[in-house]
Amino acid sequence: MKKKPCKWAVIVQIFLLYSVVGWLYEEILEVFIYRTGFTNRGFLFGPYLPVYGFGALLFWLFLDSMKRQKRFGRATPLAVFLGSMVIATVVELITGYALRYFGLELWNYDHYALNFEGLIALNPSVRFGLGGLLFLYILQPLFERLIARQPRRVLTGIAAVISLVLLVDFIMQL
C-alpha cells in the first residue's frame, strides 16, 4: 500500500508549480499581448512569481474544499469564480503594499479603469477569477493525479530541493 504524500511536500510543489505558471502567464502577456518584450517580472532570479504560488495555495485551501463540500451542497462555478477574484485581489493588494514598503513596484494598474492606488483593478481581478476556475477544475485535479502516482520519498526529495532553491534565490536577492 502506497503512503499518502507528505502534506508539506505537496504544499511546496503546489507553490512552485503555480509560481512558475504565474511567471509564464505574465511573460506571455508581456511578449504577446502588451508587446513590451521579455522581462523577468519578479524580484527573484528564477522563473517563478511567489504571489501566484501563495494565491494558488489559498485557492486550494479555501475554494477546493468549498468546491467538494457535500454538507451544504457544492459550490457553483460562479461562487468559485467570485471567491478566486476576492482571494487573488486581496493577495495582490497586500503584496503590492509590502513591495512598496521595500521600495519595489512590480506592477501598476493606474491606467486601468476601476483601479485602487494602481495596486488592484477590476480587469486583472476578473482574469484571476477565471484563473481560479482553470486552477480548481482543470489544473489542480491533473496535478493531484500526478502526485498520487509518485512514491512519497520522491515527492519529499523534490520538495526539499525546491525549498532549497527558493531559499537560496531569496537570500541572494536580499
Model-derived segments and their meaning:
Residues 1-174:
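Aromatic-rich, lipid-facing transmembrane alpha helices and their immediate juxtamembrane interface loops
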